[in-house]
């Protein structure tokens, strides 16, 4: 029953469009009926127009903002606060007032006066520079704090602490390979053998002394043997002489 009631319920637009008994005449009722039927379409059109107008306003605002930024970032050339359009206006007014010949004469007079005042202008510039330099020096000397004037005592090279840079300067030792280990062991063995050989052999000075002592000992032994032989030969001679005399 509920489903049947929902299906049989008229739609809202039909309910809005159904004429109700009113005291108005038939022409006015028809007109109101047309307005009620065209109401959703009118609302759609108004929403479309409002959205389009909003987009147009956004575009216009963006254009104005871009123009403002471009104007703000532009470079304006000016001389003594006078821009190009202002200078053009001043020139046109001067031309109208003085005329071409009068303007030329005014320009010549201005040039002559500027040339005459050039040395004075230079002198004024030099004086201003000197005055500025003196002021800067005085202000700089006055502003220097007393802590800046203090100089720490100098230290001699002997008193300066030695800085151990061995740990910083030495590079990190790379790991040894098998070939390097073999070479190191061979070098150590050769060094130990050479040290043992040097300890066994006496130095050349000792060798010379030993040779000299051995030669002196040999000479003494040979001399002693010669003296003993001579001593033994003399009694033999005496004995032989005695035997001969007895005969």
UniProtKB/Swiss-Prot annotation:
GO cellular component, one term: chloroplast thylakoid membrane
Annotated compartments: Plastid, Chloroplast thylakoid membrane
Cell membrane in keyword set: no
Gene3D superfamilies tied to this protein: 1.20.5.3310
Keyword Chloroplast carried by entry: yes
Domain of life: Eukaryota
Transit peptide: 1-76
GO biological process, one term: protein transport by the Tat complex
Region (Disordered): 137-247
Pfam families in the cross-refs: TatA_B_E (PF02416)
Function statement: Part of the twin-arginine translocation (Tat) system that transports large folded proteins containing a characteristic twin-arginine motif in their signal peptide across the thylakoid membrane. Involved in delta pH-dependent protein transport required for chloroplast development, especially thylakoid membrane formation. TATC and TATB mediate precursor recognition, whereas TATA facilitates translocation.
Stated name of the protein: Sec-independent protein translocase protein TATB, chloroplastic
Organism: Oryza sativa subsp. japonica
Name of the encoding gene: TATB
């Amino acid at each position: 029953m509920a489903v049947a009631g929902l299906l049989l319920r008229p739609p809202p637009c039909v309910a809005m469009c159904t004429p109700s008994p009113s005291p108005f005449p038939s022409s006015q009722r028809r007109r109101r009926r047309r307005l009620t039927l065209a109401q959703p379409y009118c609302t759609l059109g108004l929403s479309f127009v409002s959205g389009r107008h909003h987009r147009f306003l956004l575009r216009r605002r963006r254009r104005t903002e871009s123009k403002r930024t471009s104007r703000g970032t532009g470079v304006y050339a000016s001389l003594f606060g006078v821009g190009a359009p202002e200078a053009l206006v001043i020139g046109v007014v001067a031309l109208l007032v003085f005329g071409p010949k009068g303007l030329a004469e005014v320009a010549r007079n201005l040039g002559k006066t500027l040339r005459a005042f050039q040395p004075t202008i230079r002198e004024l510039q030099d004086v201003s520079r000197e005055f500025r330099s003196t002021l800067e020096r005085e202000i700089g000397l006055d502003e220097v704090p007393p802590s800046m004037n203090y100089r720490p005592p100098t230290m001699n090279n002997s008193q300066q602490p030695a800085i151990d840079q061995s740990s910083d300067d030495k590079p990190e030792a790379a790991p040894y390979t098998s070939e390097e280990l073999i070479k190191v062991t061979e070098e150590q063995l050769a060094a130990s053998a050479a040290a043992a050989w040097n300890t066994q052999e006496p130095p050349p000075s000792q060798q010379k002394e030993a040779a000299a002592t051995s030669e002196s000992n040999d000479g003494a032994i040979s001399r002693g043997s010669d003296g003993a032989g001579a001593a033994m030969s003399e009694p033999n001679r005496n004995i032989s002489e005695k035997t001969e005399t007895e005969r």
